[in-house]
UniProtKB/Swiss-Prot annotation:
GO CC entries: cytoplasm
Subcellular localization: Cytoplasm
Cystine residue pairs: none
N-terminal signal peptide: none
Lineage: Bacteria, Pseudomonadati, Pseudomonadota, Gammaproteobacteria, Enterobacterales
Main localization of the protein described in the UniProt heading: cytoplasm
Keywords of this entry: Cytoplasm, Methyltransferase, rRNA processing, S-adenosyl-L-methionine, Transferase
Protein known as: Ribosomal RNA small subunit methyltransferase H
Gene name, Swiss-Prot/TrEMBL: rsmH
Gene Ontology MF, one: rRNA (cytosine-N4-)-methyltransferase activity
Length: 314
């Protein structure tokens, strides 16, 4: 069952949907349904022939989505990395007018102790966005080497004490398995020789483990490639990211596809290369950050960045 009592406020709600430039009878994909904030706003702007396909890999989000009885709406349970696959099954490749992606973990996932995402609330050390698939954080930490753990903490959390924390985790697991979020958070705090002001010592490590367990960065890369594949000419891409690792991927993807294929300079070009030289797939529309008012109302919005792009006519 969905835990509807955990509130979720969609960040940059109006801005992200406005960036899609909704067409009354268009077909849209909300790749991260969550609790449906973006989906409901998109539906409110669609006409009778419009259509919205939502995707989420969290079973709790799927339960919320099932309550929407609008015939223009459909929900798919799965990762957004497969959005091109879902679109192909529906016979809609190249016909999608807009794709919206709201990256990272949602407030209900963070706020529900049973999901195991938060170091602020004690719960089982899980961290899976889809608890029915893959290994939990506790299972991975139990079987991983100190080198593997340190690499994850450094790569996905930019944790300066990654090796020290990793050794402490392995040593603790050899004595007694770490199965609770509070136990892991306390262990990380003890292993961190320097504490940052106004920041829990476990912040970066929890982010890193969560990203690794859910393959979040690979998911984003595949979702962006899929979005480019399914969009119609003039179709819009609207992406909200919440930390630099996510935003770096989105920014690089839009930039690379706005430039077109790179060909060697100063060499005779084939006919195919000449065609490719001027070709580009996306046009960057720009980016936005939340207003001071939104950040004051929802502090989790502080680090968010919204980027827009448009599919170039073929």
């Amino acid at each position: 069952m969905a835990n509807s009592h955990f509130k979720h406020t969609s960040v940059l709600l109006d801005e992200a949907v406005n960036g899609l430039n909704i067409r009354e009878n268009g077909i849209y994909i909300d790749g991260t349904f969550g609790r449906g904030g973006h989906s409901r706003l998109i539906l409110s702007q669609l006409g009778t022939e419009g259509r919205l396909i939502a995707i989420d890999r969290d079973p709790q989000a799927i339960e919320v989505a099932k309550a929407i009885t609008d015939p223009r709406f459909s929900i798919v349970h799965g990762p957004f990395s497969k959005l091109a696959h879902y679109t192909e099954k529906a016979g809609l490749i190249g016909k999608i007018d807009g794709v919206l992606l709201d990256l990272g973990v949602s407030s209900p996932q963070l706020d529900d102790p049973e999901r195991g995402f938060s170091f602020m609330r004690d719960g089982p050390l899980d961290m899976r966005m889809d608890p029915t698939r893959g290994q939990s954080a506790a299972e991975w930490l139990m079987n991983a080497t100190a080198d593997d753990i340190a690499w994850v903490l450094k790569t996905f959390g930019e944790e300066r004490f990654a090796k020290r924390i990793a050794r402490a985790i392995v040593a603790c697991n050899q004595e007694e398995p770490i199965t609770r979020t509070k136990a892991l958070a306390d262990l990380i705090a003890q292993a961190s020789p320097i504490k940052e002001k106004h920041k829990h010592p476990a912040t970066k490590s929890f982010q890193a483990i969560r990203i690794y367990i859910n393959s979040e960065l690979e998911e984003i890369e595949q979702a962006l490639e899929g979005a480019l594949q399914v969009l119609a000419p003039q179709g819009r891409l609207s992406v909200i990211s919440f930390h630099s690792l996510e935003d770096r991927i989105v920014k690089r993807f839009i930039r690379q596809n706005s430039r077109g294929p790179q060909v060697p300079a100063g060499l005779p070009l084939t006919e195919e290369q000449l065609k490719a030289r001027g070709g580009r797939s996306l046009k960057s529309i720009g980016k936005m950050k939340p207003s001071e008012e939104e950040v004051a109302d929802n502090p989790r919005a502080r680090s968010s960045v919204l980027r827009f792009a448009e599919k170039v006519s073929e």
